[in-house]
Every structure is written in structure tokens, then in C-alpha cells.
Amino acid sequence: MNSKNWILVLLLGLLWGASFLFVEILLNYISPFMIVYLRVSLASIILILYIVLSKIKLKLSFLLIFNFFIMGILNNVFPFLLITYGQQTVSGGLASILNANTSFLTILLASLILKNEPLTKSRIIGVLIGIIGVIIVIGYENISGFLNNDVGKVLILLSGLSYAFAAIFAKVRLQNVKPEVAATGMLTMSTLILSPFILLFYENEILSLNIISISYSLLFAVICSVLAYFIYFKILVSTGAGNLLICTIIIPPSAILLNAIIIGELININEFIGLLVIILGLIILDGRLIKKY
């Protein structure tokens, strides 16, 4: 990768890391469900405008719309809700560390579902190291009562499973769809899925939204969804999907740094050591740095 692409990869990791900070801030003003709804709905409106203004031709079919529906659930609705509800009891920094297990879960699931994604020696080592990192973050002494006492952490770990299924589904069913079209379709379907629940159960909250919550939500949608997706498309076209794993390595440190600087939120020693172990696992999964030496 050239220096320009490295900057884009680092910037994407920073933007996605910022999503945990935005959730942390918005939880002070609105409900988790409303946070997710405003993020996907505002982002979808902006992306639809982009598609229209760019005069991108859409060849929609029932199958493609169905694929967008599934991707909306797996890549937006489920993980966004799980992370946002999880962050009610889990700090943004810790949430970003736990969410880094997405890559390990994707590798494991892909090896079971896809014929061309075998579990190589380096992948097995990377996944095992990643699992050790997650255990360190949770705390070995807390494992036995984890499901009962750490619901927020469980929700965030489950979000990684949803992202993993989404990555595999996209690889199989959306391979020939333009990334910007896929993102627009996915976010639009997410908005349509969530809208009935908003109208039925959150009508009072919609009416009570203030300028602060709307402003933060708009920033959240623009920075962490729209702008992030545009950079994602650029990386995908110019360097390939393989370099997106580097973003996964950058997200937790970015989230921790942003949360520490802006809201003074720090992680403990277990979480820090676990983070380093998880990053090591991701580097081994990526493989390129190991091959150099």
C-alpha cells in the first residue's frame, strides 16, 4: 500500500473507533433503540441522495432486495442494537476490545461454511490467541458467572457473531453489487425494519428529541456510517478487502484514545493486556507482517 492508502486505512479505523464514543455520549440523551434508528435512517437518506445525484443506475430485483434485507439485519440492526444496549453497562473502550472478536469469529465460521476459506495454521494460532485475549479482558475468575453477571459484555460479543455471518453472506450474495449500492440498500432496509417499532413504541421519544441529540445523531451517521463507508469503498477498490483487517486492529486503540481524551474514560490493566493479545492475534491472522520476518 502507498502512503495515501495507509492514511485512508488509519482514518477508517479511527472513524469506526469513534462510533463507540458517539454511543457513549448519546446514551445520556436518548434510548439505545433511538440511537440505532437515527444512525441508520439519517445515513440512508444521505446515501440515497448520493446515489441519485451521482446518477448511479440501480438494477433492483426481488432477490437483491431480499439480500439487502438480510444484510440490514445481520450487519446493522442486530449488531448496532446489541452494541448500543451493551454499552449501557460496558464502557466504550471495553466494548471496542470485545467487538474485535469479529475477525476471529468470521474466520471460524467461514472455514465451516465456505469451501475456499480453510483454517490454515496461522489462522488457527491467530484465533486461539484472540480467544485468550478475550478471556483476559473478561477476567478468568469471571468466566463461570459471565453469562449471568455480564449481560452487556455478552451482547457485545454476540454482535461480533452477527457481523461474522454478515461478512460471509455478503461474500456469497453481494459479491457483484457495487459497494455504495450495497451500503445504501442495507441501510435503507435497516431503516424500514426499525421504523414500525419506532412508530409503535417510541412516538413520545421522537417528539421529545432536542437539538443536542439530533446534532450528535447526525454527526454519528455522517462520520461513522456515510464517511466511513465512502473510505471503505475507496480502500476496497484501490487495495482490496485484505487491508480492511488492519482497520480491525486500529479500532480498539482509537476508541480507547478518543474515550480517554473526550470523556475521560479509562480501561483497567486486564483490558489493556487483553487488547494487546487480541491485536497480536489479528496481526497473525493478517499474516503479512509475519511473512516479512
Label the model's feature ranges.
Residues 49-55, 103-125, 253-272:
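C-terminal transmembrane-helix exit sites in multi-pass transporters
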Residues 15, 19-20, 48-99, 135-136, ...:
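Specific transmembrane alpha-helical segments of multi-pass solute transporters/efflux pumps
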Residues 106-108, 112, 144-202, 231:
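Transmembrane alpha-helical segments that form core, pore/gating elements
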